[in-house]
From Swiss-Prot:
Residues 82-92 have a biased composition (Low complexity). It comes from the Eukaryota. Residues 40-162 are annotated as: Disordered. This is Putative uncharacterized protein FLJ43944. Residues 47-60 have a biased composition (Polar residues).
Length: 221
């Protein structure tokens, strides 16, 4: 690298001797800078701020007064106990309000000896009484049902069992007229279904009498 060192005198001599250089005139340009004393900053509100309407002073006072008031009104101990009882009753599916004995329990006592005489025959029983059957039916009353301490549903409507609906008017007659063997008397004691005693037909009775007469002829004793 070559370095040229020129003094100011050398430079002046060069510029003076060289006439080919153009003349350069420098003009002072007046530049004015206007600097404002107070800077005004314009801030545009964001869209989130535009969506929220301005809150008036009354609304602000009301919102400030709200935290002072309790969220839930205070209740007296009696009302709180009653509300707790209402919630407890609402949680139970069906509270045992009034348990009425069913008509089946009212008609049949704990140890029935004779059928209930106050039972009114239904329409099917009246029709059956018009056409009496040959076979006599012995209907044992169902055992007394025990009432639970807290029934799931109160017995509002109790329908009669199909045994009582289908039984003819022979229920009104005493059980003395019904003849049954000791085996038949012992078996249906625990069963709810009626025991049927079938009487022999006239043909069977005649055949039985003929056999007895023939046996008597052979055995006069």
């Amino acid at each position: 690298m070559m370095r040229w060192n020129f003094s100011p005198e050398d430079l002046s001599s060069i510029f003076r001797n060289n006439s080919t250089l153009p003349k350069i005139t420098v003009k002072n340009v007046d530049i004015e800078f206007t600097i404002p004393t107070a800077v005004t900053i314009e801030v545009e509100p964001s869209p989130v701020q535009q969506d929220n309407p301005p809150i008036s002073s009354e609304q602000a006072d009301f919102s400030l007064a709200q935290p002072d008031s309790p969220s839930l009104p205070l209740e007296s101990p009696e009302e709180s106990e009653s509300s707790a009882q209402q919630e407890a009753t609402a949680q139970t599916p069906n509270p045992p309000k009034e348990v009425e004995p069913s008509p089946v329990q009212q008609e049949f006592p704990a140890e029935p000896t004779e059928p209930a005489k106050e039972v009114e025959p239904s329409a099917t029983q009246q029709e059956a009484s018009g056409h009496p059957l040959k076979s006599t039916k012995e209907v044992n009353p169902p055992p007394k049902q025990e009432i639970p301490a807290q029934p799931s549903e109160p017995p509002e409507k109790v329908e009669l069992s199909p045994v009582l609906q289908q039984a003819p008017t022979q229920l009104l007659e005493p059980l003395k007229k019904v003849e049954c063997s000791p085996v038949q008397q012992a078996v249906p004691a625990q069963s709810s279904e009626p025991s049927i005693v079938v009487e022999p037909s006239p043909v069977q009775q005649i055949a039985h009498l003929c056999l007895q007469s023939s046996l008597r002829k052979w055995n006069p004793l």
